[in-house]
Amino acid sequence: MVNHFRIDRVGMEIKREVNEILQKKVRDPRVQGVTITDVQMLGDLSVAKVYYTILSNLASDNQKAQIGLEKATGTIKRELGRNLKLYKIPDLTFVKDESIEYGNKIDEMLRNLDKN
């Protein structure tokens, strides 16, 4: 039986810790301005899909952030191992969160409707 409460709790802890690690431990300029928005865990806690956003809308900055996060994965996992009491630290997969951009686009469309 899968304990969804534990999965969600571990996901929230990983989200909090990864945000803190990116701010304090990772010195790569490519990941400056990256914010972790959500973490989805696999049922056995072996894989964590980490969703992130970046302040810039430029495609080149998004690509650089993705590369920077992939390069920093080892450091992030090591720090997670120090800070979390888990049997095995999950493998991390970083995915750009498109939901904020989508929401901004809808807000803009609604504002344009109000003007007309």
UniProtKB/Swiss-Prot annotation:
In the record, what terms sit under GO molecular function? ribosomal small subunit binding
Taken from the UniProt entry, a GO cellular component term is: cytosol
Gene3D superfamilies, alphabetized: 3.30.300.20
The main location is cytoplasm
InterPro entries named among the record's database cross-references:
KH_dom-like_a/b (IPR015946), RbfA (IPR000238), RbfA_dom_sf (IPR023799), Ribosome-bd_factorA_CS (IPR020053)
Q: Domain of life here? A: Bacteria
Q: Where in the cell is it found?
A: Cytoplasm
A Pfam family of the record is RBFA
Keywords, comma-separated and alphabetical? Cytoplasm, Ribosome biogenesis
Cytoplasm is among the record's keywords: yes
Would you kindly state one Gene Ontology biological process term found in this protein's UniProt entry?
Answer: ribosome biogenesis
Family label: Belongs to the RbfA family.
Entries under PANTHER family matching the protein: RIBOSOME-BINDING FACTOR A, CHLOROPLASTIC-RELATED (PTHR33515:SF1)
User: What does this protein's UniProt record list under function?
Assistant: One of several proteins that assist in the late maturation steps of the functional core of the 30S ribosomal subunit. Associates with free 30S ribosomal subunits (but not with 30S subunits that are part of 70S ribosomes or polysomes). Required for efficient processing of 16S rRNA. May interact with the 5'-terminal helix region of 16S rRNA.
Q: What does the subunit comment say?
A: Monomer. Binds 30S ribosomal subunits, but not 50S ribosomal subunits or 70S ribosomes.
> This protein is called what?
Ribosome-binding factor A
Q: What is the lineage of its organism?
A: Bacteria, Bacillati, Bacillota, Bacilli, Lactobacillales
The gene for this chain is rbfA
